[in-house]
Regions:
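RNA-binding basic/glycine-rich loop and surface signature characteristic of RAMP-family CRISPR effectors
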Residues: 1-309
């Protein structure tokens, strides 16, 4: 499943009271453009998912064809969800024949179907949540100068993050946005043609860890073994030891009961010593995600919002 589809599911699953950035469409034919409003100060999805806006300059004295470009690299990086074990799609044929006259040929349609355990990586760059670039030699501004001043006027601050001048929202709003995202992950829904293919889309297994850098060392924990999805507790244990200097808290495993059969109980036994040392937490995905969201919202992990470099 494409990363774009996964991001669409997350965006569509945001709480009903969370406003999303309006989409603007302009131009005609081959010169059409579509982009969001580009206001990460106002909209959580512009902040976390990023955007790019390139429009013709309307400033007095602007040269013909000159454009204004504002861009925000994604704060939430997502990978393509790929089947852990090779799975061959099959063709499903359907017909539409309701109210057709007797002897009339039905309308035939087909689509591909598959069942698979899909896995992918995800990275949330916490120091950049609610932090917007205003300029730099090699960095496009996320906000024009006037809006940057507006952020500061509403309680924001000016900072330098990774050698780039930025404005930053108050910590309370930054905490809230991360908490909303985590709770959305716990109840994500989506998929096409749900009238016929409705099903649970919430994660069966999540591995969460606060890492000081941007490397995910746990991509090989869930793998194929004997043509089945396998959780390798030995790999997890060795990666935790190898990356101990980069980990800034326990590794949290959210694992739905019944997913992968008895492997959940076996992993709990294999990792019992790490759980006793509070280096690993094991629970239901919804419980793990919601608990972490509450901890972040209450300010228990504010140090994660500061760049460690």
């Amino acid at each position: 499943m494409s990363a774009q589809a996964g991001r669409r599911w997350l965006r569509d699953s945001l709480p009903a009271g969370e406003p999303t950035s309006p989409v603007i469409r302009s131009g005609e034919g081959k010169k059409q453009q579509a982009y969001t409003r580009g206001r990460p100060d106002l909209y959580l999805d512009d902040d976390l998912f990023g955007y790019m806006i390139a429009v013709k300059a309307d400033d007095a004295g602007a040269k013909k064809g000159e454009s204004k470009t504002f861009m925000r690299d994604t704060v939430l990086a997502t990978g393509t969800l790929v089947s852990v074990v090779p799975s061959k799609p099959v063709m499903d044929f359907g017909t539409m024949s309701r109210d057709f006259e007797p002897g009339t040929h039905p309308v035939i349609h087909e689509h591909e179907m598959y069942t698979a355990d899909l896995a992918g990586d995800l990275l949330l760059d916490l120091p950049r949540v609610g932090t917007f670039e205003t300029g730099g030699r090699t960095t496009k501004a996320a906000l024009p100068g006037g809006l940057a001043e507006e952020v500061i006027g509403k309680g924001g601050s000016e900072i330098v993050l990774r050698d780039v001048q930025c404005v930053r929202l108050p910590i309370e709003e930054r905490r809230r946005r991360v908490a909303v995202l985590l709770r959305t992950m716990a109840m994500v829904k989506g998929g096409a043609k749900q009238s016929a293919h409705y099903g649970d889309r919430t994660p069966g297994l999540v591995i969460l860890a606060p890492i000081k850098g941007g490397t995910n060392p746990f991509t090989r924990v869930v793998r194929e073994r004997e043509k089945a999805t396998y959780f390798d507790a030995d790999v997890l244990r060795e990666e935790i030891d190898a990356w101990a200097d980069e980990l800034d808290g326990p590794v949290r495993i959210g694992w739905a009961p019944g997913f992968l059969g008895s492997q959940r109980d076996r992993a709990g036994s294999d990792l019992a010593d790490l759980m006793k040392e509070e280096r690993v937490v094991l629970g239901h995905p919804r419980t793990v995600l919601n608990t972490l969201a509450s901890e972040i919202e209450s300010g228990d992990h504010d140090s994660w919002f500061d760049d460690p470099r």
